[in-house]
């Protein structure tokens, strides 16, 4: 991912497993490069924070890592991004569940999983298309790097 971005890119995370993975795996190289709510559990933080970052620094790439649970907390802000012509990229990790909640249930509640999986899969590509966002679906792609690079470097 980092190889596809400018070194000045601002990385924003929502709350969930994707937040942990981003914090652990992304090669951050300077202060202020990561915007996250930390351990405060504020699902829905990512998309509005990415909008703010992109408005404050329109010359920098802004990428929001989110999960299917977190993005649904403020999904309407996709409309704001399109209406205000804000250049953000959303990397959505969709596992059809509240992944971090599910993981905690598996680890600490003897595999008793309750209300952390969604009954019906959500089609986020169609939703984003409906808001007028450009979309790329990496599901099932054996080598996602070329598509990811194109998506991240596309202007809006």
Q: For each of these PLM feature ranges, what is it?
A:
Residues 1-53:
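Active-site diphosphate/adenylate-binding microenvironment
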Residues 1, 14-16, 37-39, 67-69, ...:
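Fold-independent oxyanion-binding glycine-rich loops
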Residues 56-147:
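Conserved thiamine diphosphate
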Residues 29-30, 84, 131:
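Short, structured coil segments at secondary-structure junctions
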Residues 9-11, 32-35, 60-63, 87-91, ...:
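Structural motif
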Residues 1-15, 135, 139-145, 149-150, ...:
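Phosphate/pyrophosphate-binding active-site segments
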């Amino acid at each position: 991912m980092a190889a596809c971005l400018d070194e000045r890119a601002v990385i924003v995370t929502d709350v969930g497993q994707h937040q942990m993975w981003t914090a652990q795996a992304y090669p951050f190289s300077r202060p202020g490069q990561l915007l996250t709510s930390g351990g405060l559990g504020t699902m829905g933080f990512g998309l509005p924070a990415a909008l703010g970052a992109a408005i404050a620094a329109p010359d920098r790439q802004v990428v929001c890592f989110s999960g299917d649970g977190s993005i649904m907390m403020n999904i309407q802000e996709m409309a704001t991004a399109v209406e205000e012509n804000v250049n953000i990229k959303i990397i959505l990790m969709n596992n059809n569940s509240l992944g971090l909640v599910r993981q905690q249930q598996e680890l600490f509640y003897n595999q008793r999983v309750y209300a952390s999986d969604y009954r019906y899969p959500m089609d986020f590509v169609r939703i984003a298309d409906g808001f007028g966002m450009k979309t790329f679906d990496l599901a099932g792609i054996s080598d996602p790097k070329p598509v990811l690079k194109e998506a991240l470097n596309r202007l809006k």
